[in-house]
C-alpha cells in the first residue's frame, strides 16, 4: 500500500472535512455503463470489496482513493472496421464516403463496440495532511493527479488546491547540493541524478548507481549543466528522487521505517494497513516539512 510517487498540491488548512463520511457515499464509483467510455468515483482505500468504509482518517491525515473503470477500445480496431465499412460503401456507390459521413460511421461503430469492450480497473490513492494543508497523490503524472483533485473538488463542492511550486529555482538548489553545498539536516545524497544543459533541447546526462560527488560530475557542472533530478535519502527511512518539477519519484520506504512495523502490535490485514498508513503519512509529513523551508515551497491562502 506504500505510495511510490508523490505529486503535491497545497490547500487552505481552514477547509472543513467534518462531513466527509456522510458525503462520500454519494460520490462512490459506479460501474461504467454499456455506452460509456469511463467512470470515476471514490472507493475504499482497503479495496473495492469494502463497501462501508470509503476513507481512512488518522488524526490530521485523511486517506482517499479514486477508482476508475475504463473501456479498452483500441483505435486500431476501430480504424480497421471503419476502413472495411468505407470500402463496402465505395463498392456500392462508386465513391468513398465524405468526411461527415465517415465520422458518423465511426461514431456508430464505437457505439456498437462499447458494450462488448473490456473494462480496465485502476485506482489512485491520495493522502491529505489537514494540519499543514497539502495533498500527496500517488502518481508521477500531473494529469492523473489533477483528475484526483477534480474528484475531491466535486465531492466537497469547493477545493481550492493548487499545484505545489517554489519561490526559488529548484534546478539551482539541486545543483548546489550536488556541488557540495550543505543539504538540509537528515538528508543525504543518493546514487542517481539527471543533468541537463541550460539551453532548451541541450544534452541530458543520466547517472545511476554511482557516487554523485566525483570528478565526472564536477566536469559536467563546470560546463554549465544543471541537475534536474536528484536521488536523496532521509535518514535510513525514505529514499526518493526529487525533480525540478517538484514531483517525488521512486519513493521507497527503507528498513529504518519498516523495522517499526515489525515491532507494532497488529492483528489482521486491516490493522496492518492502518499501521502502514500511520507510518507512511508521518514520514511523508517529515519529508515535506524538511523540504518546505530550503525550497521555499508555496503556501495556500486561508
From Swiss-Prot:
GO terms for biological process: DNA recombination; regulation of DNA recombination. The keyword Cytoplasm applies. The keyword Cytoplasm applies. Pfam families: RdgC. GO terms for cellular component: bacterial nucleoid; cytoplasm. It comes from the Bacteria. Keywords: Cytoplasm, DNA recombination. GO terms for molecular function: double-stranded DNA binding. Belongs to the RdgC family. HAMAP family: RdgC. This is Recombination-associated protein RdgC. It comes from Xylella fastidiosa (strain M12). The lineage of its organism: Bacteria, Pseudomonadati, Pseudomonadota, Gammaproteobacteria, Lysobacterales.
Amino acid at each position: 500500500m506504500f505510495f511510490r510517487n508523490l505529486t503535491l498540491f497545497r490547500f487552505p488548512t481552514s477547509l472543513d472535512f467534518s462531513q466527509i463520511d456522510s458525503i462520500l457515499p454519494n460520490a462512490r464509483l459506479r460501474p461504467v455503463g454499456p455506452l460509456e467510455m469511463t467512470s470515476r468515483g471514490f472507493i475504499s482505500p482497503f479495496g473495492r470489496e469494502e463497501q462501508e468504509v470509503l476513507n481512512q482518517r488518522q488524526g490530521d491525515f485523511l486517506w482517499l482513493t479514486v477508482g476508475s473503470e475504463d473501456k479498452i477500445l483500441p483505435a486500431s480496431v476501430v480504424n480497421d472496421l471503419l476502413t472495411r465499412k468505407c470500402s463496402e460503401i465505395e463498392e456500392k456507390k462508386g465513391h468513398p464516403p465524405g468526411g461527415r459521413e465517415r465520422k458518423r460511421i465511426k461514431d456508430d461503430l464505437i457505439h456498437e463496440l462499447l458494450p462488448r469492450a473490456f473494462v480496465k480497473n485502476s485506482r489512485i490513492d491520495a493522502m491529505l495532511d489537514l494540519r499543514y494543508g497539502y495533498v500527496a497523490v500517488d502518481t508521477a503524472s500531473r494529469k492523473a493527479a489533477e483528475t484526483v483533485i477534480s474528484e475531491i473538488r466535486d465531492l466537497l463542492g469547493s477545493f481550492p488546491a493548487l499545484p505545489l511550486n517554489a519561490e526559488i529555482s529548484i534546478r539551482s538548489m539541486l545543483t548546489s547540493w550536488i556541488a557540495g553545498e550543505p543539504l538540509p539536516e537528515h538528508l543525504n545524497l543518493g546514487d542517481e541524478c539527471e543533468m541537463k544543459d541550460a539551453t532548451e533541447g541541450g544534452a541530458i546526462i543520466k547517472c545511476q548507481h554511482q557516487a554523485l560527488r566525483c570528478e565526472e560530475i564536477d566536469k559536467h557542472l563546470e560546463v554549465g549543466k544543471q541537475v534536474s533530478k536528484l536521488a536523496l535519502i532521509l535518514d535510513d527511512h525514505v529514499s526518493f528522487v526529487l525533480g525540478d518539477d517538484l514531483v517525488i519519484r521512486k519513493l521507497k520506504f527503507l528498513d529504518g521505517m519498516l523495522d517499526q512495523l515489525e515491532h507494532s502490535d497488529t492483528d489482521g490485514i486491516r490493522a496492518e494497513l492502518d499501521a502502514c498508513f500511520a507510518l507512511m503519512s508521518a514520514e511523508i509529513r517529515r519529508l515535506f516539512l524538511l523540504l518546505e523551508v530550503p525550497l521555499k515551497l508555496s503556501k495556500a491562502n486561508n
